Amino acid sequence: MRASRFLFATLRETPNDAEVISHQLMLRAGMIRKLASGLYTWLPMGTRVLKKVDAIVREEMNRSGAMEVFMPVTQPASLWEESGRYEQYGPELLRFKDRHDNPFVLGPTHEEVITDLARNELKSYKQLPVNFYQIQTKFRDEIRPRFGVMRSREFIMKDAYSFHATQESLQETYDVMYDTYSRIFTRLGLDFRPVQADTGSIGGSASHEFHVLAASGEDDIAFSTESDYAANVEMAEAVLVGERAAPTQEFKLVETPNQKTIADVCQFLNADPKQSVKALLVQGVADEKGNVPVVALFLRGDHELNEIKAEKHPLVAAPLAFATEEQLQAFGLTAGFTGPQGLVEKGITVIVDRAASVLSDFVAGANEADKHAIGVNWERDAQITEVFDLRNVVEGDPSPDGKGTLQIKRGIEVGHIFQLGTKYSEALGCKVLGEDGKPFTVTMGCYGIGVTRVVAAAIEQNYDDKGIIWPQAIAPFEIAIVPMNAHKSPRTLEAAEALYAELQAQGFDVLLDDRNERPGVKFSDLELMGIPHRIVIGEKGLDAGTFEYKGRRDAEASNLTKEELLAKLAR
């Protein structure tokens, strides 16, 4: 591509509404332009990157044996009513009617559409397993679109859906897709982690997320220093460490006026938060008569409650909800001063986190306003109904697989795979005839990659103060050739044209910067756009038989012979 025929839409200043670095650099590099809130036009520079991501995803999906389809973004509302998600999905689902007053939605996902296709086209177990995928636009009417294409309303996804006769077959395809995703993100040149994840609103029995590690990520990822273990912090198990020591202190009540938070109390008492417990009083599961009990959750003072773990306890109501003031009053409890002493005797279920369960001589609420207890010990002073993993893991915790300790970093979710089971096939009646001639409900899996999000995530992981530093596989151009004073020096232009033709013939994606611009402007643009290799051709270099080469990550340029240059580019 000749730069003189290409749209350069670079900006010198960062737009005020761009918050994260990927949004800033995509605007400045001329990759995207905002059309409306959460809607972006992809310019030629951005489209080249997008298509390269698209190509790698498509190649690996085809390699996995999946078959490409293309489904409508506009979907009949009746399908969503069948699945039960028409009302469940909430305002992110854009609903509308056509001129004939028929209700439709703009698809944020395609489970309903693909299940409808499968129930009409798949008739026998002999057609299973099968895996369909598409690369298609989605629309979610986000209340606050932000971070550019990272959280936009309209975006491109690769979504795949598999259909199976057995759980074993689903597991086989799930494993294939896990490996396929790992190959995709490796080829994209990203530092990523596959992590165990919660199945969330889509549902199902097993789930992994694929996260690109970046400081701007929205999720906390815990991974082992010595193994492949990795999990979303929401899912990572907090391993029990140590045993409870025998009591050495007497139980005692102390005045703590107006000290309600654990931090305030520990500072007031000159105590270590690690030697304290804090209470969270939540609603339990209602009984047959509709009575809602109170459940007391206790954690170590320096730990945070993991709501997803708490909601998985069979005695805790989901979604998690705090006990009401009326419920607290019924048991004579005061928020901010609740301790475990006497709660079991009052009929309150006391669930204690593993780390809190091994404490002795600890600080706790006194169950009286403006008072706390010190020297509290389990069994002697307070009873436990059950010990349960309730907390978020922290850096330095033992890895659940017994290998190394946990590190925690921020991650950007770019892929997600689920074992859906029969959630959608049951709801939409997707059945095939079995070997015995009887119909059975098929089992499903689904697998998504945020294609547009991958582009932003790659930038969040690869940039400096000059601009983007693309992994070569998805750079808009792999190589930029800059002939110095090309409009005055036919010799440099001729040499640039010859090298341009040669590199293109070798399969490189090359930009010949033949613009009538100052060298400084060209260099700034090329660094901002993140082109991995820059070759400058000048009169002095031609006299010496060398080319000036600079890799995007290099601090200094170097003069190379043609043979050295070609060897460098071939690596």
From Swiss-Prot:
Q: Which domain of life is it from?
A: Bacteria
Any one GO MF annotation of this record:
aminoacyl-tRNA deacylase activity
Q: What is the reaction catalyzed? A: tRNA(Pro) + L-proline + ATP = L-prolyl-tRNA(Pro) + AMP + diphosphate
CDD domains attached to this UniProt entry: ProRS-INS, ProRS_anticodon_short, ProRS_core_prok
Q: Where are the transmembrane segments?
A: none
Q: Where in the cell is it found?
A: Cytoplasm
Under Enzyme Commission nomenclature, its number is 6.1.1.15
State the top-level EC class. Answer: ligase
Q: Which InterPro entries match?
A: aa-tRNA-synt_IIb, aa-tRNA-synth_II, aa-tRNA-synth_II/BPL/LPL, Anticodon-bd, Anticodon-bd_dom_sf, Pro-tRNA-ligase_IIa, Pro-tRNA-synth_IIa_bac-type, Pro-tRNA-Synthase_IIa_type1
Q: What is the protein's known function?
A: Catalyzes the attachment of proline to tRNA(Pro) in a two-step reaction: proline is first activated by ATP to form Pro-AMP and then transferred to the acceptor end of tRNA(Pro). As ProRS can inadvertently accommodate and process non-cognate amino acids such as alanine and cysteine, to avoid such errors it has two additional distinct editing activities against alanine. One activity is designated as 'pretransfer' editing and involves the tRNA(Pro)-independent hydrolysis of activated Ala-AMP.
Give the PANTHER family listed for this entry: MITOCHONDRIAL RIBOSOME PROTEIN L39/PROLYL-TRNA LIGASE FAMILY MEMBER, PROLINE--TRNA LIGASE
Complex formation: Homodimer.
What does the record's free text say on domains? Answer: Consists of three domains: the N-terminal catalytic domain, the editing domain and the C-terminal anticodon-binding domain.
Entry similarity comment: Belongs to the class-II aminoacyl-tRNA synthetase family. ProS type 1 subfamily.
**What is the protein name stated in its UniProt record?**
Proline--tRNA ligase
